[in-house]
Amino acid sequence: MTKCYQTTLEFSSVKRRRVEADFSGGEITSDAGALLLSQADKRLGLCRDVARALGDQRLRARCEYSVEELIKQRVYGLALGYEDLNDHLQLRHDLAIQTAVSRDKPLSSAATLSRFESRADREAALAIHQVLFDQFIAAHEQAPRRLLLDFDATDTPLHGEQEGRFFHGYYDRYCYLPLYVFCGRHLLVSYLRQSN
């Protein structure tokens, strides 16, 4: 029979909040994977670098959440399978996701995230891609002798009257057809396209 000697697993604390995983009850979440995402993101610095690249033109005195916190909340939510902004009506109160974003209070609302995403433009997309390029370069001690770029398109089904939707005969549905460019395991470009 297997014997377990470790009853808890400790994570980095957030302000006054001690964070540990155990199985004795208390505050329960099905999204504890956000804590692991947060640890990986700390090592990579991806959300931090994207926030710096985007900058913040808002009046800081009127803002409760930093750009980095908004990005982390949205990215971690997407990684956990919560694509819709309305999911954040509940997620903002989840202790694991709050902890992953390094807050000990409720996170931003769906409306705040929506306003944040609505400000995104071509310049923001280029700035984010520059961060991806920089991460790719930083992952190599020296320049690779050869680069093999993998261009992939995949369908993203649409279920409403979204702007720019077209019917794609091959996929037999309305969809977008985003383009992804990888070099090995590194994503270099993610470009949302219409499927026409």
Q: What does each of the following model-derived ranges do?
A:
Residues 1-196:
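Dynamic "connector" segments at or just before major functional cores
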